């Protein structure tokens, strides 16, 4: 039978489950709302939806490469215990592989896609893991990159996946260089690949701050502008990847390293688990007991 959009909407509101899960449940129960709710509960989907409101600030990053396409993903869970769970770790790797193979435009689109191109949706697979593992799991973000045959990816995971970096180079196939730059980005935490990525508004805002700092220091107005330009160069050196001193040879900037290799930096993505997420503070004993109580 045909399932109305209104019925799907109502079931989503009552259970918090994903759209495709709700539609499938209604189809399997011939549109019976209460039976559909029970079916979602039996499958753990409604239970998973309730957990989705809990803060997930732990987790892992993972990378995947397939030919000329690569991705880095961040998937969050609630505790470090689950972050070290092999089942969760496999899920994160599978999600990275899904992103590479299906090339979604957004997390929302990825969740509605058949997992790795077949069967249940990725969102459904994640909900099943939530029900099995007993914690909220959130596919937070991803970055996709493409290269030519004359390019190379540098995929680097730091601290077992607490930081994940994907660097894309063109004009070289030097895998060691690409990986070294991934390691560099993990350590130096740049915000931009090159100066061109820094918006005019951001540069002007930084220039204004530096100008006010110089004036507050009592510097003569006629030398303030030179001071501002000098300090602005330090801003670029701190936040722009190609302007930074290379971590393995601080006498050499990344831009020089790339030039020597005849390579160009197409782009990079750096994900650190939980950055920007407000984490609920619990002591270690409380975290242990929370896990014990789930058993």
From Swiss-Prot:
Domain of life: Bacteria
Record bears the keyword Cytoplasm: yes
Record CDD domains: UBA_EF-Ts
Localization annotation: Cytoplasm
Keywords noted in UniProt: Cytoplasm, Elongation factor, Protein biosynthesis
Family annotation (InterPro entries): EF-Ts_dimer_sf, Transl_elong_EFTs/EF1B, Transl_elong_EFTs/EF1B_dimer, Transl_elong_Ts_CS, UBA-like_sf
GO cellular component terms, semicolon-separated: cytoplasm
Family the UniProt entry places it in: Belongs to the EF-Ts family.
Originating species: Brevibacillus brevis (strain 47 / JCM 6285 / NBRC 100599)
Disulfide bonds: none
Name of this protein: Elongation factor Ts
SUPFAM superfamilies: Elongation factor Ts (EF-Ts), dimerisation domain (SSF54713), UBA-like (SSF46934)
Location of the region described as Involved in Mg(2+) ion dislocation from EF-Tu in the Swiss-Prot/TrEMBL record: 79-82
Primary location class: cytoplasm
GO terms, molecular function: translation elongation factor activity
Role, per record: Associates with the EF-Tu.GDP complex and induces the exchange of GDP to GTP. It remains bound to the aminoacyl-tRNA.EF-Tu.GTP complex up to the GTP hydrolysis stage on the ribosome.
